[in-house]
Amino acid sequence: DGRNDTITLQVTVTDGDGDFAQQSVTVNTVAGPLFNDAPSGGSSVVTTDEGNIPGMGSQHETSATQPFGAATDGSFKMELHGADATVSIGGTELKVENGKLYHNGVEVTADAAVSVPGGAHGTLTVTGMDADGTVHYTYTLTTPVDATGNASNRPGEGDTGRGEAVHADAFDVTITTTGGTATGQITVDALDDAPVLSTLDTTQTTVADGEAALTGTLSFTPGADAEGAQVTVEVEGQTFTGTKANGEWTFTGGSDGSSFQLNGTAFTYTRPSSNTTDGRNDTITLQVTVTDGD
């Protein structure tokens, strides 16, 4: 009942003819803390960036993506009302005892961090807890996120998709004390990557009558969502579609006898004979579109 009490035990022993002996002992009880209040907390949202996944992302930064990396630090607050607790993060069980966070008997710190398995697109690592119940963690995005039909509740940055926030991962949090249970979730958003077309230039300013080949430089990166990416080149009414296999792009199209080839970053567009000997002055425009996998 949370009160300090005095307990008195009095014992009397009486023999067969009425003689007796009597003694008493007094015990003072001191009330300990009561943990009847239910815990609360356990939720947070963090943002990562697909464009900064090492070896995958386009690294193309905008005002919306500049502050974010593939790895991000986050935290959530627990209110335990002084009680010890069992904390489950993504199914990994930790203990709070005397204001410190433990995993398998070892205090969780930056030097003794705990990895939480089960991430769909990255890894979650718990790195410690402050005295006020704030749990710290790091999430690292390791694989691209399909943005198709997967928009987060936060605005994007236009039709290209770069900077669009998409849902990447979620880890359930359960906090249990003698006062009850609280549930929360660590939610991870990823800023969608987009292709970058860095160079499109020709090595010729004019093409002589009868000359079929137009050469130049084309360089681009599909970004993190490279799987399923496509490149199209539209020129002189023809559309060439590029697909990548074994590290090389191959273009098909050109129903009029024309062709488009890309060797590394060097391209060659070969005009059909009907366009090279018609005696007209022409303007040749190449329009290149790079579309990533989502």
Range-by-range predicted roles:
Residues 1-294:
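Acidic/polar, solvent-exposed loop/turn segments
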